[in-house]
A protein has these predicted regions:
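Non-catalytic substrate/cofactor recognition surfaces at enzyme active-site rims
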Residues: 1-332
Length: 332
């Protein structure tokens, strides 16, 4: 699980960029090595499934056009090979600034894959081999944790589920950004959709044009609405299951926010679940930290952030508040 954005000495970040650069300084984010697991059993105490919470997006295979569960498909294969056809529920923990690929030491990784997998590496290629490698590491974590976690099976558990709509400070659009968006929107609206040529090329080019128009239009709409609506409503779910908790958000949430929540949570384990909630254009945007915002990468741009870093901290505070309230009610 590695950083998504790198920072050069000019203090400007780039997403998944080449780090073999004389201006490369450091990675913007750190890394989160925790895999949170919750196992389920039947009345005979036989394993029936597990929740696997990993702070890493399932986007190892990119720039290919087919439906795929990415490394989660490989995870299911690896775990079910040993434990049978159990149910596995993947969760993506906060990982807005993390990615399932390394950004330096690539030659060393190639050598490892070549020696570890042999001809299979040549047949599958880098990306699919990396998926298999990730799956094997998650499966190894599953084995290790199951060996001791299975000693503490619970037949009863107190469950508390709280849902609140929290109001988060928006990422406001400046006058300059508004003017830029209006100009860009006018330019894209002056272009016409293609109606001839190869269908695949036509679909691609028309999709790009449609996307660019919507991108600029979204900025214009946000600017015009933000004076009367400076807050962004988000449906927050927090669940207490004895000494384990789950807290959702709808964003690609930067890692630091998760650590702030987990560090202050009164529960033994707190599963943070990102991209859980509203779908479509109103959900799933990045929520960067102040550090990310200042780095000016694409995931911190006006297009990709509906909520500001201040709103991100508000999400932390609201989540921690509910976690503490639920834990206190369980102890009454």
């Amino acid at each position: 699980i590695n950083c998504r954005a790198s920072l050069n000495s000019c203090f400007h970040n780039a997403c998944v960029a080449n780090t073999n650069d004389e201006n490369f300084s450091h990675y913007e984010a750190g890394a989160d090595h925790f895999v949170n697991l919750l196992f389920t059993f039947d009345e005979k105490e036989e394993l029936t499934g597990a929740i696997i919470n990993v702070p890493c997006p399932s986007q190892n295979t990119e720039n290919e056009y087919y439906l795929s569960a990415d490394y989660w498909n490989d995870v299911r294969i690896a775990i079910r090979k040993k434990y049978g056809d159990i149910y596995l529920l993947p969760q993506c923990a906060a990982a807005g600034d993390l990615a399932p690929r390394i950004l330096h030491y690539k030659q060393a990784q190639d050598r490892r894959f070549r020696l570890k997998y042999g001809e299979s590496f040549a047949e599958k290629g880098l990306e699919r081999t990396a998926r298999q490698d990730i799956a094997e590491r998650i499966a190894a974590a599953f084995d290790e944790v199951y060996a001791w976690a299975s000693k503490e099976k619970k037949r009863e558990a107190r469950i508390t589920h709280v849902v609140e709509t929290v109001q988060l400070s928006k990422r406001l659009i400046s006058d300059e950004e508004y003017a830029y968006a209006k100009q860009g929107y006018a330019q894209e609206m002056a272009k016409e959709y293609r109606t001839d040529g190869d269908p695949q090329e036509r679909l691609f080019q028309n999709s790009v044009l449609y996307s660019l128009r919507n991108r600029y239009k979204g900025i214009i709409d946000r600017y015009e609405a933000q004076k009367e609506q400076p807050k962004f409503p988000m449906e927050l779910h927090v669940i207490g299951l004895d000494d384990v908790a789950f807290a959702s958000n709808q964003f690609e949430l930067y890692m630091d926010y998760q650590h702030r929540i987990q560090a202050r949570s009164p529960f033994v384990q707190t599963f943070v679940v990102q991209l859980a909630g509203q779908s479509g254009e109103g959900g799933g945007s990045y929520l960067c930290t102040q550090r990310g915002f200042e780095g000016r990468g694409y995931s911190a741009s006006m297009y990709c952030n509906l909520v500001s870093p201040a709103g991100g901290q508000e999400l932390v505070e609201e989540t921690v508040r509910l976690l503490k309230e639920i834990r206190a009610s369980q102890e009454e």
